[in-house]
Design a protein with these regions (language model features):
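Extracellular glycan-modifying ectodomains
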Residues: 1-388
Length: 388
């Protein structure tokens, strides 16, 4: 009996020791991570996700009382956590082993598609309303301007979503746009893209549309403008990589299937010349093929997001006019199509231009203006106030 009690006591002690060792290891791990975060400079950009990362939020009484500081700090910690990429990969694989159809805001869809999940509560609706109101005011002030919003992959390719998956927020946004913006200045492409949803119009592993998807939107825009779109058959389609793994894949680090990026070229493209960022550098092509070997192959279009690209073309075959294209990254593969109708095309990204469009128009007068954004990126954008 005494031997049993001694054995039981030893087991209890061993269990406590193991528990204390586990607690100690967790504390050491968390302490080590905290020290690493202190000693390691915050990253400003994630090459894997092709986006800016959160900065350490400012601590104020107002931000704490409203809960804004806590939310921002939680996001900051999750994005700056040491070894985050490896943790994301491990967590996602475990999630999939458990049979889950979604991880880290990404649905594992049909046919190797990875589709981002959006819910109504994910958006700052005050910011959304401000952006819609500012854009509607701009359109009323500039009757020569139009707006084209690209739907997210999750809604355009809703048939690829897993069963019972739900997407929220975008429909409410489109309702606001339809109610506030002049109807004749809206170019709706939701139905256009839906009509081609069996084709390769969005990348499987990235949030962007493919060049083919951009072409179908270009057709709709050209008809709206009274132009004859360049027939698809007149382009030489050049696949330049078939190993592209995009931003959506970077969020889960598993699943999906490598994408192909294709460029649409046409005889006469040598007539174009390009000036970047008001004389920073020049080019003779819509494409920077060196980017295919880098971390972001999608940057093959114009070398990535640029503040301002001034595209000129010989007058022959154009309408002799100037187009101002105000866009996010979705406009990068759209611009080469639109530029074929103009003698000059000014491509602007508001995120990198520190002046209002009205001042820019004094330097670059435009006959036509097109605002082209992905719906969700527009909803979250904090630079739309420059549309004035």
């Amino acid at each position: 009996m005494k031997d049993f009690e001694n054995y039981s006591d030893r087991k209890t002690i061993q269990t406590r020791i193991r528990f204390l060792c586990f607690i100690g290891a967790v504390i050491l791990l968390l302490s080590g991570c905290a020290v690493c975060m202190r000693l390691t400079p915050d990253r400003t950009y994630s090459a894997e996700e092709r986006r800016m990362l959160s900065k350490r939020p400012s601590l104020t009484k107002k931000s704490v009382m409203s809960g804004k500081f806590q939310r921002k700090y939680e996001t900051y910690l999750s994005e700056q956590f040491p070894g985050r990429t490896h943790f994301v990969t491990l967590r996602t694989r475990l999630t999939r082993l458990l049979g889950e159809r979604e991880a880290n805001g990404v649905y594992f869809g049909k046919d190797d598609y990875l589709l981002e999940r959006y819910q109504t509560q994910d958006f700052d609706w005050k910011q959304v309303r401000k952006n819609v109101k500012r854009t509607a005011s701009f359109l009323k002030e500039y009757p020569n301007a139009d707006v084209l919003f690209v739907p997210v992959k999750s809604s355009a390719l809703s048939q690829k979503l897993p069963m019972f998956a739900q997407i929220g927020g975008e429909a409410q946004f489109f309702d606001q746009v339809r109610q506030q913006a002049p109807r004749q200045q809206q170019i709706a492409v939701e139905d256009v893209l839906k009509a081609h949803d069996s084709e390769y119009i969005y990348y499987r592993t990235d949030h962007h549309w493919t060049t083919l998807g951009a072409y179908y939107a270009y057709e709709a825009w050209a008809k709206h403008m009274g132009f004859t779109p360049v027939p698809k058959e007149q382009f030489q389609v050049m696949p330049v990589t078939d190993t592209f793994m995009g931003t959506t894949y970077a969020k889960v680090r598993t699943g999906g299937k490598a994408d192909t990026i294709s460029l649409y070229e046409q005889s006469g493209d040598s007539a174009f010349s390009f000036d970047y960022n008001m004389g920073e550098f020049q080019s003779d092509s819509f494409y920077d093929l060196s980017k295919l070997e880098g971390e972001d192959p999608y940057s093959v279009f114009f070398g990535g997001n640029q503040a301002l690209v001034d595209i000129r073309r010989a007058e022959e075959g154009t309408n002799g006019k100037t187009l101002l294209l105000i866009k996010d990254s979705f406009g990068n593969c759209f611009a080469p199509f639109a530029a074929r109708h103009y003698a000059r095309t000014i491509v602007v990204d508001l995120r990198y231009v520190n002046l209002p469009i009205s001042k820019l128009l004094r330097v670059y007068p435009a006959d036509d203006i097109l605002i082209l954004y992905n719906s969700v990126q527009f909803m979250k954008d904090t630079d739309i106030h420059k549309l004035k």
